[in-house]
Amino acid sequence: MTEPNPNKQEVELNRTSLYWGLLLIFVLAILFSSYIFN
């Protein structure tokens, strides 16, 4: 019953989606701040 591959793939998928979400929030924060300060 020890199969680390599917769990590892799920963790990597969640990690990459988390990184894309943080990158998207970071870009939106930069655009929003530049829109306010201009």
UniProtKB/Swiss-Prot annotation:
The chain crosses the membrane at residues 17-37. Signal peptide: none annotated. It is found in: Plastid, Chloroplast thylakoid membrane. It is a single-pass membrane protein. Pfam families: PsbL. One of the components of the core complex of photosystem II (PSII). PSII is a light-driven water:plastoquinone oxidoreductase that uses light energy to abstract electrons from H(2)O, generating O(2) and a proton gradient subsequently used for ATP formation. It consists of a core antenna complex that captures photons, and an electron transfer chain that converts photonic excitation into a charge separation. This subunit is found at the monomer-monomer interface and is required for correct PSII assembly and/or dimerization. PSII is composed of 1 copy each of membrane proteins PsbA, PsbB, PsbC, PsbD, PsbE, PsbF, PsbH, PsbI, PsbJ, PsbK, PsbL, PsbM, PsbT, PsbX, PsbY, PsbZ, Psb30/Ycf12, at least 3 peripheral proteins of the oxygen-evolving complex and a large number of cofactors. It forms dimeric complexes. HAMAP family: PSII_PsbL. This is Photosystem II reaction center protein L. It comes from Mesostigma viride. The gene is psbL.
